[in-house]
Regions:
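Bacterial N-terminal signal peptides that target proteins for export
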Residues: 1-11
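Bacterial N-terminal signal peptides
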Residues: 10-20
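Short, compositionally biased P/S/T/A/G/V-rich stretches that sit at domain boundaries
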Residues: 24-62
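Aromatic/hydrophobic beta-strand junction motif of beta-rich domains
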Residues: 61-75
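Extended low-complexity, serine/threonine- and proline-enriched intrinsically disordered segments
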Residues: 71-97
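Cysteine-centric segments in proteins
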Residues: 81-85, 103-104, 114, 126-132
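Aromatic sugar-binding surface patches on proteins
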Residues: 99-117
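Short, exposed beta-strand-loop hairpins at the edges of beta-sheets
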Residues: 117-147
Length: 148
C-alpha cells in the first residue's frame, strides 16, 4: 500500500474550508413552477399585471419600457422576446428567508429570479418569456403579454 505524503494530507484542511463556504450541494434545486409578467413600466404609467391577464390595460406604453418577469423555481434557458426579437435582461436572484421572499444577500434558500427586460415600444406588440426547468420534469413554461 502506498503511503500518503505530507503535501496531499495538507490539502484536507483547505478543501474542508472551501466546502464549508459552498452552498449545500445535496439540496435539490426547486423545479420551475411559474413564470409570469408582473409589471410593465414606461414614461406614461407603471402597470401591475394581475395573474392570468394577457393585455396591458392602464395606458398605451410607448418609448423606453421595462417588463418585469417573476420566475419561481430554477431554469436554464430563459428567453425574452418582443415582436419576435430576442431581448437582454437584468436578473436578480430571489431567496426565501423564513416567510419572506427577498433579493438574495447570502441568507435563505434560492427560490427563483426576477428578470427585467428593456425594450423600445413603438406600437402595440407581443412580449413572450419562456424558460425550461433545470430538473425533472424539465418542463418549459411560457408567459405572453400584449403590450398596447
Amino acid at each position: 500500500m502506498k503511503k500518503a505524503n505530507a503535501w496531499s494530507l495538507a490539502l484536507f484542511p483547505f478543501i474542508g474550508l472551501w466546502l464549508g463556504a459552498a452552498p449545500a450541494w445535496g439540496a435539490a434545486a426547486p423545479a420551475l413552477s411559474e413564470v409570469r409578467v408582473f409589471k410593465v413600466e414606461s414614461a406614461r404609467c407603471t402597470e401591475s399585471i394581475p395573474d392570468r391577464v394577457t393585455t396591458t390595460q392602464m395606458c398605451t406604453h410607448r418609448g423606453p419600457t421595462q417588463v418585469s418577469v417573476m420566475e419561481v423555481g430554477l431554469g436554464n434557458n430563459s428567453v425574452g422576446r418582443f415582436n419576435g426579437a430576442v431581448l437582454n435582461a437584468r436578473r436578480t436572484a430571489v431567496c426565501q428567508v423564513g416567510n419572506i421572499s427577498q433579493a438574495c444577500n447570502g441568507a435563505g434558500q434560492l427560490m427563483g429570479y426576477i428578470y427585467v427586460f428593456d425594450l423600445n415600444v413603438e406600437g402595440p406588440g407581443g412580449f413572450e418569456y419562456s424558460n425550461s426547468s433545470i430538473n425533472p420534469p424539465r418542463n418549459t413554461l411560457k408567459t405572453q403579454l400584449n403590450i398596447l
